[in-house]
Amino acid sequence: MVWKGVPMKKLLFIVNPRAGKTKSRAPLFDAVAQFSRAGYLVRVYITEAGGQARDITARWGGQYDMVVCAGGDGTLNETLSGLMQLEQRPLLGYLPCGSTN
């Protein structure tokens, strides 16, 4: 539920579409819907190359209340590396979607 007059929290959602064995992304759409219902304004970035999760997090992460990444251990590592470059670090969430998850 979102209350009128209460500013929405901002969430940066980084998705690695190449992670894991499955091609179904329905759970990720469900996650975005859940965050939205919880009062977050969600910005989704789909990575296209290695290192991009780190770069996106380092450049934009400081403007968000929470950064959530969906991917494998490499995506999580990149996102953490990007967060370490920030003076003010937002909360971190992880949706494991790697080949061993």
Task: Please identify what each model-predicted range represents.
Residues 1-7:
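Short, Lys/Arg-enriched N-terminal segments with co-localized hydrophobic residues
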Residues 9-101:
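Small-residue-rich beta-alpha loop regions that form the catalytic core of phosphotransfer
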